[in-house]
Regions:
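Conserved N-terminal entry element of GNAT/NAT acetyltransferase domains
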Residues: 1-29, 33, 37
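Conserved acyl-donor/pantetheine-binding loop and adjacent beta-alpha core of acyl/acetyltransferases
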Residues: 96-154, 160, 208, 212
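Conserved acetyl-CoA-binding loop-helix of GNAT-fold acetyltransferases
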Residues: 152-157, 161-174, 196
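Conserved beta-strand-loop-alpha-helix junction that forms the acyl-donor binding cleft
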Residues: 151-160, 182-192, 208-209, 219
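Conserved beta-hairpin
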Residues: 76-97, 154
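A short helix-loop-beta-strand connector motif used in the catalytic cores of GNAT acetyltransferases and
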Residues: 60-84, 143-146
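Conserved GNAT acetyl-CoA-binding A-motif
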Residues: 146-148, 175-186
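Conserved active-site alpha-helix within GNAT-family acetyltransferase domains
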Residues: 166, 178, 187-204, 208-211
Length: 220
């Protein structure tokens, strides 16, 4: 009696943090493209990005998010972080996470808003105003105290089931060093995933014409 050979173990996932002073523009674009692929079927994202040239729009959107995560303050302190999950065997990018650090300014950043407006309009078109309203509501839902904010986390479809997303979130939890972590889940089905990582739901942000965002918080 014979049995089929067991499937070979899948290569491990490593998580790396990009250095703001060492991340080149092509790196930002590569990571942005990975996130664009990860969110290519996300209902919330697609509801705010016109169908025309949607692929390039998504890549521009997430490349801008990566650049934002790599920025530093006037004193050189990082205002965010960008982590990437890679296949330990061949270095293939599997996913990424973009974070805002406790050092980032809160409230309305008028210069930043104006600087980012051309990209927002190019990506979101007629949905730009709706997006800004949702973002303002998300800002109001964030904790008042110091915390890390998980802006984006996603993995490419071929990497799902390998633990890359969990590894990315856990990496950020360790970096938080006892501070809370806050995020919004755009799809209700992903809430249990975050709950398994220790998050708890704290409220919702309404999305006109779509599912509300679920606010979640993790505390050490």
């Amino acid at each position: 009696m014979t049995s089929p050979d067991p499937a070979p173990p899948r290569p491990r996932v490593h998580v790396l943090t990009l250095r703001p002073d060492g991340a080149r523009e092509d790196t930002a674009r590569r990571v942005g493209a990975v996130l664009a692929e990860a969110f290519a079927t996300d209902p919330y994202t697609l509801g705010l990005v016109p169908e025309d040239r949607r692929g390039p729009r998504l890549e521009r959107k997430f490349t801008a998010a990566v650049r934002q995560g790599l920025r530093a303050g006037a004193d050189g302190a990082p205002l965010g972080a960008v982590d990437v999950a890679v296949d330990a065997a061949d270095g293939t990018l599997l996913g990424a996470a973009v974070w805002t650090s406790p050092a980032a300014p809160r409230g309305v950043d008028v210069p930043g808003l104006l600087a980012g407006l051309p990209t927002a309009v190019a990506v979101h078109g007629r949905h730009t105003l709706a997006l800004k309203r949702i973002q303002a509501a998300c800002e109001r839902a964030r904790p008042a105290g110091r915390h890390w904010y998980l802006e984006e986390v996603g993995t490419v479809p071929s990497a799902r089931g390998r633990g890359a997303a969990s590894a990315l979130v856990r990496h950020g939890q360790r970096r938080a060093s006892g501070l809370p972590v806050h995020l919004e889940a755009s799809v209700p089905a992903t809430v249990p995933f975050y709950e398994r990582l220790g998050f708890r739901a704290t409220g919702h942000v309404p999305v006109p014409g779509g599912e509300p965002l679920t606010c979640l918080r993790w505390e050490a």
